[in-house]
Amino acid sequence: MSFTAPSDPVNKPTKVKVSQLCELCHSRKALIRRPKNLSKLCKQCFCLVFETEIHNTIVANNLFQRGEKVAVGASGGKDSTVLAHMLKLLNDRYDYGIEIVLLSIDEGIIGYRDDSLATVKRNQQQYGLPLEIFSFKDLYDWTMDEIVSVAGIRNSCTYCGVFRRQSLDRGAAKLGISHVVTGHNADDMAETVLMNILRGDVARLEKSTAIITQSSGSPIKRSKPFKYSYQKEIVLYAHYMKLDYFSTECTYAPEAFRGTAREYMKNLEAVRPSCIIDIIQSGENLALKAKKSNARKRVVKFVDGNRCARCGYLSSNNICKACMLLEGLEKSRAQVAIENDTSADGAALKLRALEKLSF
């Protein structure tokens, strides 16, 4: 889609060197050099170009259907806040004909999520959009703070990632919504490709850059309108538009493996600014060679579309990942309770200690 540089009749531009002028309007001073193509743009042209690119991504990938009810995974952070603002803006401008709902998950992280949810509630008022909040405590009877106290901080992102993804699906299903959009940006996508390579997780490489994902048999699909949008530009857009967002990092994030991939990405980007898009495009072209089937194997393989035997959630295994994690948590909590039982006498404590020994 083509666009025309916005005019500014009120603030007439002062004379500046040609090399400092915006490459689009040729009248205002350039304030940004875009990392993906190194073009120099002024504030007004950058915002218009950024909005137009998101619209083009939505149209090119046919993300929305008229009359569709769409849930924005809202955390209060920069990505989801800009996403909510952008979808509201573009829906009004281009008449997508979609109904937008803010869907938030309260993981139960005191001093972080409670503050970010306050931002989401302000966004609800600012954008005039309905808001629904679901909590880990209600869905799983655990908060993230409780999980960390039992499982340790190094495992926090594993639990949070699994429970959060499932919570978004469960929340959307309860609201009768079949489409969830998330604020995953180009940096996130490139980091995911790198993480899968570093972990040797080839099974996920092929689908790690998909803009739309949906398990077979699932009524919920997910899409990422910011797939080609750099994080730097999302932050800059939020700054220029004076959007209200929460910028504090999660309490447990520093221990995440993603942080290692992020630091590596920053080093690469300093040498080659286009590396983020380059990695995404490489990921898009990755395909796994089909494996030969072994007729003698009698292992029953579960594919997407099967249901967890415990909770009924979609799972590629007999027991879903969330239920497996919950089982481990309950066992750990029981063990902690036994070890903290001060009512037991000395002999009983010694017996328990002996039972742990192997000979």
From Swiss-Prot:
GO biological process assignments: protein urmylation; tRNA thio-modification; tRNA wobble position uridine thiolation; tRNA wobble uridine modification
Gene3D superfamilies: HUPs
PANTHER family per record: ATPASES OF THE PP SUPERFAMILY-RELATED, CYTOPLASMIC TRNA 2-THIOLATION PROTEIN 1
GO cellular component: cytosol; cytosolic tRNA wobble base thiouridylase complex; mitochondrion
Gene: NCS6
Protein name in UniProt: Cytoplasmic tRNA 2-thiolation protein 1
Quaternary structure and interacting proteins, as annotated: Interacts with NCS2 and URM1. May act by forming a heterodimer with NCS2. Component of a large molecular weight complex of more than 250 kDa.
EC numbers for this chain: 2.7.7.-
UniProt pathway: tRNA modification; 5-methoxycarbonylmethyl-2-thiouridine-tRNA biosynthesis
Organism name: Saccharomyces cerevisiae (strain YJM789) (Baker's yeast)
Molecular function terms, GO-annotated: nucleotidyltransferase activity; tRNA binding
UniProt cross-references to NCBIfam families, sorted A to Z: TIGR00269 family protein (TIGR00269)
Localization (cell): Cytoplasm; Mitochondrion
